[in-house]
């Protein structure tokens, strides 16, 4: 399985190698070719046009090198295809049309009519053991095609012409069978597998990619030859030159047999079939176009050997007894032999090809090295190169045949194998030796070829035998070299296939040169019977197709070998002049091809320069876009910085405003607290003033009571003095005693009256005082209770008012704070909205400017790109026209030699020019598509940016609406806060009024309390005054008692003792009024004065006791009042 090329599978590289692979594919079986083509189509549907054009170009550019037997091989290869006939035949038509013309003379009518004419080409194209192996080889190539995607690019151009050298044989076959090949040719480029594998990713310009190859400009045969070297590595000039010269492919293959793979050439067991099944298809005949799905089946591999047996039966030899046919299976042990180096597949070491440039033996050697899989027999298409064509025409396809192998093998053995050997030096040395050998054997080969064609019987065995002898004779000089260069291949194994290939290709070589139509026809007609009976049992024989022909001939019967030797000698003798002419033509073509290679290299350099300029322009565009993006980012950064600075300033202003408002609130709070403190101080002063006023009132009342009491005491003192004077005057004399008694009585009566009056007044006053005091006490208690209740109510009301005031203040502060916050937020949002609007406007302006700049840049870039594309396309058109002119010159030279080659060259030039035009248009389309994709991407980017801007506008609009809604909410909130603040102020005023009323009530209560306290003080003073009066009275009584004791006892005896206690008890029990009445009654029968005095004294004593008790009670009462007054003052305080 050939791996793909390393650099993304450059599709244009393997086109000519793919041709050679297609020859191998045709020999292995066309039925297997199509699965690979299908698999390849899946990945390369978009590149069918490139592949089709490449296939047409290659097929038509190399038409002159196709052998006459190619149409027959094509028919055999296309026999067993199911649904792919139309596609395959499409491409074959363009390739094989010249071959039809070439074959018109020998047997034009037999090609379409006979089902086996395709097989007739096989004996002439491929080795003897596989004359009918084209069907089998086509089958085997399909498996190889699945493995090597690069092999099917233009393989179907020679798909039906499997036995031809990649270029020349397809042309010859198209000349020989025009109708059949044209039916088959044009459909082949349409098959998916034959399309060049151009991957869409290669349109992306990579530094290591070949732009010309990617765009399809390298699809020409010259470009393909250059690309053969690219698959193996970077060897542009040397490899291309050697490929154009046709050097070293087979020779290097012989020199390095193990280059493709380091495995022994052993045939796989599944391909080694017993000889008993060789005759399965031997007796079957097929009409042209008949569908036999089993013809190309796995049994078809043995049909090749069977047809070979048949061939040798016609020549008198037993094919089954032939050692070469039995030993050939181990010849190709490696299933993937096409992975050899570029020199091996290019056949630079093949001396036989150089010795006989026009002979099909060269072609056989070259294309026998093409087989890719072990099941691929030596491609018969290699041997169908007409002798008339220059060897260079057959060599480039031979060189291109190695490209699929190199493509399959590039990843493994590319660098290591080419570094080990200098295959170019070997190719040059072998070229010199081959030139000498060519001159020596020219005459002999010519004579032998003429003899072989003259004695050609119409049967298929006779021309085959003659061609075998011719090839063997021609290969005699190079057999030693080929045997020496193949150390890994057993001579017995490889001899038969090589000999058969040479013999098969000998007849068409001679016939086109000399124009012997009967010989060609006889060689072609009997060959048509072979394809149906071919069942190749040697799938891997083509691995080493360049075995010495002498060994192969030695395996044949002696009579056959002698006949072939004689034919080869005659041909060698007759052909020196023609070989020399062909050598001159090949040299001229070599010079032309070298010039074309140089032109193509220059063209590639120009395209690389164009790519560099495009890349520079693209880089400039990218830099411009980046600069615009950077400028936009800078503008955005500046706008955002300005916005941030603006927001910072607003934040600072708002914070300063908030601090000032906080300070104002603190000042207001301090003022309110100061006012409250002043009010409390005024209330305290008023309370103290009321207390002082009450105290003054009480003092005044007490002073009045004291004054009254003192006046009474003064009167009592006067009375006492008078009594004392009376008592002292009574002791003077008795006469005066009566007077004194009378006076005493008067005095006692007056005293009694006075005492009764005093007592009555005292009782009344005391009672009144007691009642007044009780009433006052009750009033005082009630007032105290009421005052305490009012104080408690005032305290509660004050606490409630204070709480309400505190709550209202807190609520007012909170509402004011919230209001300020809302105002700040509203102002911040408004400023933010304004700043965002300004920034949005700036962004809009900036984006509009940037979009305008970008549009202008895009227009300029588009115009510049279109101008460059136009200039490049004009240059490409000029180069293509120049190449077309060179192709015209080359066709003119070919027309001088052969009319058929001239027509084919003209057709190839026409197809090439058409292909170039289509390639130019496709390249333009590709570039336009790329630019359109870039423009679409830019448009998408602009659309995305526009959508982003629209989205930002939407967001800003929504933000603005949200800000407006927030502003409305804030306004409503502000109104609510204002209304609440009004309500709070009203409530605060109500609280102030209630506080003032409470303070007034408190002041009134304080005034009342002070008045009560003053009254209490006044009463206390009065009590003290009365107490003093009582004390004075008690002293007076004591004095009276002393005075009574001082009286004479006679006065004391007057009073009955029994009546004393009674009187005392009566005085104690009776009120003072009856005592006074009793005292006022004078005693009967006794002296009234001493009794009266005694009674008066008892009465006074009793009154003194009563006064003492009264004073004690008053004192107790005053003490209780003092305690109560202190409590009241403490409560009021």
Swiss-Prot record:
<feature type="region of interest" description="Disordered">
    <location>
        <begin position="89"/>
        <end position="198"/>
    </location>
</feature>
<dbReference type="GO" id="GO:0005829">
    <property type="term" value="C:cytosol"/>
</dbReference>
<feature type="coiled-coil region">
    <location>
        <begin position="577"/>
        <end position="727"/>
    </location>
</feature>
<keyword id="KW-1017">Isopeptide bond</keyword>
<feature type="region of interest" description="Disordered">
    <location>
        <begin position="1062"/>
        <end position="1085"/>
    </location>
</feature>
<keyword id="KW-0832">Ubl conjugation</keyword>
<feature type="compositionally biased region" description="Polar residues">
    <location>
        <begin position="165"/>
        <end position="182"/>
    </location>
</feature>
<feature type="compositionally biased region" description="Basic and acidic residues">
    <location>
        <begin position="259"/>
        <end position="276"/>
    </location>
</feature>
<feature type="coiled-coil region">
    <location>
        <begin position="773"/>
        <end position="870"/>
    </location>
</feature>
<keyword id="KW-0965">Cell junction</keyword>
<keyword id="KW-0970">Cilium biogenesis/degradation</keyword>
<dbReference type="Pfam" id="PF21007">
    <property type="entry name" value="FBF1"/>
</dbReference>
<keyword id="KW-0963">Cytoplasm</keyword>
<dbReference type="GO" id="GO:0005814">
    <property type="term" value="C:centriole"/>
</dbReference>
<feature type="compositionally biased region" description="Low complexity">
    <location>
        <begin position="473"/>
        <end position="482"/>
    </location>
</feature>
<dbReference type="InterPro" id="IPR049390">
    <property type="entry name" value="FBF1_C"/>
</dbReference>
<dbReference type="GO" id="GO:0000922">
    <property type="term" value="C:spindle pole"/>
</dbReference>
<feature type="compositionally biased region" description="Low complexity">
    <location>
        <begin position="295"/>
        <end position="310"/>
    </location>
</feature>
<comment type="function">
    <text>Keratin-binding protein required for epithelial cell polarization. Involved in apical junction complex (AJC) assembly via its interaction with PARD3. Required for ciliogenesis.</text>
</comment>
<dbReference type="GO" id="GO:0060271">
    <property type="term" value="P:cilium assembly"/>
</dbReference>
<dbReference type="GO" id="GO:0097539">
    <property type="term" value="C:ciliary transition fiber"/>
</dbReference>
<comment type="subunit">
    <text>May interact with FAS cytoplasmic domain. Interacts with PARD3. Interacts with TRAPPC14.</text>
</comment>
<feature type="compositionally biased region" description="Low complexity">
    <location>
        <begin position="125"/>
        <end position="134"/>
    </location>
</feature>
<dbReference type="GO" id="GO:0005813">
    <property type="term" value="C:centrosome"/>
</dbReference>
<feature type="compositionally biased region" description="Basic and acidic residues">
    <location>
        <begin position="415"/>
        <end position="424"/>
    </location>
</feature>
<feature type="compositionally biased region" description="Basic and acidic residues">
    <location>
        <begin position="102"/>
        <end position="113"/>
    </location>
</feature>
<feature type="modified residue" description="Phosphoserine">
    <location>
        <position position="142"/>
    </location>
</feature>
<keyword id="KW-0175">Coiled coil</keyword>
<dbReference type="GO" id="GO:0090162">
    <property type="term" value="P:establishment of epithelial cell polarity"/>
</dbReference>
<dbReference type="InterPro" id="IPR033561">
    <property type="entry name" value="FBF1"/>
</dbReference>
<keyword id="KW-0597">Phosphoprotein</keyword>
<dbReference type="GO" id="GO:0005929">
    <property type="term" value="C:cilium"/>
</dbReference>
<dbReference type="GO" id="GO:0043297">
    <property type="term" value="P:apical junction assembly"/>
</dbReference>
<keyword id="KW-0206">Cytoskeleton</keyword>
<dbReference type="GO" id="GO:0036064">
    <property type="term" value="C:ciliary basal body"/>
</dbReference>
<feature type="cross-link" description="Glycyl lysine isopeptide (Lys-Gly) (interchain with G-Cter in SUMO2)">
    <location>
        <position position="960"/>
    </location>
</feature>
<protein>
    <recommendedName>
        <fullName>Fas-binding factor 1</fullName>
    </recommendedName>
</protein>
<feature type="region of interest" description="Disordered">
    <location>
        <begin position="211"/>
        <end position="544"/>
    </location>
</feature>
<feature type="compositionally biased region" description="Polar residues">
    <location>
        <begin position="325"/>
        <end position="336"/>
    </location>
</feature>
<feature type="compositionally biased region" description="Polar residues">
    <location>
        <begin position="459"/>
        <end position="469"/>
    </location>
</feature>
<feature type="compositionally biased region" description="Acidic residues">
    <location>
        <begin position="277"/>
        <end position="286"/>
    </location>
</feature>
<feature type="compositionally biased region" description="Basic and acidic residues">
    <location>
        <begin position="221"/>
        <end position="245"/>
    </location>
</feature>
